[in-house]
């Protein structure tokens, strides 16, 4: 396996190998993206974007199984330095199903759409007072993001009141970053899993 930075010279090969269909944005912005592909047997099978302390990953429409997933993440864990362990954010449900059987989940991003709305404004830091707690969240034209994971909040009653608070304050959409144990309860409130962050060690 080897890592290649995606650029105008290899983007068409990458699109073909990964069986991508919606590619205009990728082609138009390839030189602005900090995206890398992984090649196995001279074919792209995977890509990732590095962030400060994790990578966001994609397998495109390439056929995968648990053997390939383990091989790729073992390779990356040995070749990328993230203080001893690799954190990987996964967005695709099929890949999530495989990852759930292989790795430990650190946190989960969930979302609920209330109504359509514009979210192209800057975020404002705000606080919700729930059960004697001041809970930080960010509001961008009524599109809400609240990191329950970083605030160590997993009490179902607090989460339910917070959800109600956001809806009553005309939220268009609500995004939470949650601890893994909260997923089932969040789904009962109508939230869907957007991504999971896994610990590769």
Where are these predicted regions, by residue range?
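Active-site/acyl-donor-binding loops of N-acyltransferases
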Residues: 89-119, 175-201
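Flexible, charged surface loops at secondary-structure boundaries
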Residues: 29-32, 78-82, 122, 138-140, ...
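Conserved GNAT acetyl-CoA-binding A-motif
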Residues: 79-91, 168-178
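Conserved donor-binding loop and adjoining core beta-sheet/short helix segment
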Residues: 28-71, 129-154
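Residue-level detection of beta-strand scaffold positions
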Residues: 6, 11-14, 43-45, 68, ...
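Asparagine-rich low-complexity intrinsically disordered tracts
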Residues: 2-5, 10, 40-41, 53-60, ...
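Conserved acetyl-CoA-binding loop-helix of GNAT-fold acetyltransferases
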Residues: 65-78, 154-168, 188
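Short amphipathic alpha-helix that is part of the acyltransferase structural core
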Residues: 1-25, 111-132, 142-143
